[in-house]
């Protein structure tokens, strides 16, 4: 019986939010922060984080120290400060309260956690497009130009193959560019995807799909090649069959807000509701039963798995010693003396045959002794009967 293909592709799975990959935003205040500001922070968080993949927690340090507070730099009393934790809690990114005086600083402060110009553009393109390549320019113009050509070539190479995918997508991959001078304003986005959050000479690139989920490893400098990008793009359209490594479907998401408008647009594009509880349960089973799957409820990142992964198969490096081993001491050379041929000696009897012959001899000996004993006993009986 032929195996039934999975009804979902890797891209489809990328739209599902299983609820176990939430960021945590800790907003630290103290007694010197005005109560009105604390209240405004709570109200803004209720709106901004209601549809986001971020948990909000207000922490008053005046009521006691918090274990994560040690990750903060020197804090100014009376000024809120934030700390964004990765889903696994291992990484943290600090956010400072606006130093300028915007109309609503509380809103601007919290909105920077889930929104930015590049993220807004990504969300608009991720829903209709097959995938999106986030390209971060470097300060080195020559490297940036070469890497951008690799990005464009990868998209040109994969686009003719889209109609042949298990679930064709009409919209080819797109590109979102972060100029070098805008890197600082996209620090949360870049940090969450494993990219450098400050200007560097090398350009950077990463493939994204679905609800802002990363596909493959982030690429830097000379690693931004057409081949690497094309491989990641090819995986996006594959069936999520059991043989495909689940690490491709479990890349990190960036912090974002996914409201009613995004859910409606995704439903129209996919033909199913990725937020439907039954769909989420089915996708959760698909992810959990494949190789390199993440245990239920675990939030471990997928980065470590990619070290041994390439398009669904694993590679291991086997060390081979190409130089012959040199013995500690050279082996002694024995002198061989040719002797004249002599008469052939009889072949030695194999140990097994010798042992068998010895056993037979012993049995015959015992039999003769027994016969003699019986004969002697018989003669004695005859003599006694004669008397």
Predicted region positions:
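Non-globular targeting/processing and membrane-anchoring segments
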Residues: 3-387
